[in-house]
Regions:
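Active-site catalytic microenvironments in core metabolic enzymes, especially phosphate/sugar-handling
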Residues: 1-253
Length: 253
């Protein structure tokens, strides 16, 4: 299957009309979209280490969640870290496609996976663009018990918690940066909101708002989507070599 054919097939499953207006995703770069894809690498972020690994391991295609190019490039020179990666990729005939907010929204994508991992039942979309998911746990938990459970399930280095001193049962999730969805989660009836990033100012008001808040890390709340991409590629071409690579560059010391 060629790069172009593969992208078109993936767009049938992750439609372009799900993309947020401010977002930039799609086929990010390709020297030849008619090139056959035999070896693919899946990652959350296209870091320079990921690019170098792809070059040294004869990868034809990188599929990422976060866009390789987010802000417009005014020039393509090796003075820019983004342009430098694009140059390397083009020189080595490696294509990149990214899916970002449409993979957040799509059925079976980032937020459905996150809800499933956390044991949230009957999860339904909520919030602007219906990006988030909200549902209920099978049993009520204390905030402390749920926080430790979540930390283990997501394999987090640690989580930030702001406790409204209420039990946890109706839980809303938004992978990545979800601070703008706290109000929508509260309006939808959530007693607890989980996201990758919420921020100090919002978390400081959790008690006053009457909602438990857990900040579990951008990477840890979105990394599971790599398995979603892997499954899609394997179904489209069972003979394709597909590898997932961890791109987390942030450490908790």
């Amino acid at each position: 299957m060629t790069v172009k054919e593969l992208y078109e097939k993936l767009c049938e499953r992750i439609p372009e009309d799900l993309r947020e207006e401010w977002d930039n995703d799609g086929l990010m770069c390709s020297s030849d979209d008619g090139r056959e894809v035999k070896r693919a690498l899946i990652t959350l972020d296209v870091t320079e280490d990921i690019v170098d690994y792809a070059i040294s391991h004869d990868i034809d295609l990188i599929v990422s969640h976060h866009p390789l190019i987010f802000k417009p490039l005014k020039s393509v020179t090796d003075d820019s870290h983004v342009a430098r990666k694009v140059i390397k990729l083009i020189k080595n005939d490696i294509s990149v496609m990214s899916f970002h907010t449409r993979a957040d929204k799509v059925e079976g994508g980032v937020n459905d996976i996150l809800a499933d991992i956390l044991g949230i039942k009957n999860a339904v979309p909520f919030g602007e663009g219906f990006l988030g998911r909200i549902g209920t746990l099978e049993e009520e938990l204390t905030m402390e018990d749920f926080s430790y459970l979540l930390k283990g399930l997501l394999d987090c280095d640690g989580v930030k918690v702001s406790d409204a001193l209420i039990p946890v049962q109706k839980v809303a999730v938004v992978g990545g940066d979800g601070k703008s969805y706290v109000g929508a989660a509260l309006k939808a009836g959530a007693d607890t909101f989980v996201s990758g990033r919420i921020g100090y100012n919002v978390m400081a008001e959790a008690g006053e708002m009457g909602i438990n808040l857990i900040e579990a890390g951008h990477f840890f709340t979105e990394q599971p989507v790599t398995q979603f991409f892997q499954g899609l590629l394997h179904r489209l071409d069972p003979d394709m070599y597909v590898e997932i690579m961890d791109s987390n560059v942030i450490r908790l010391i």
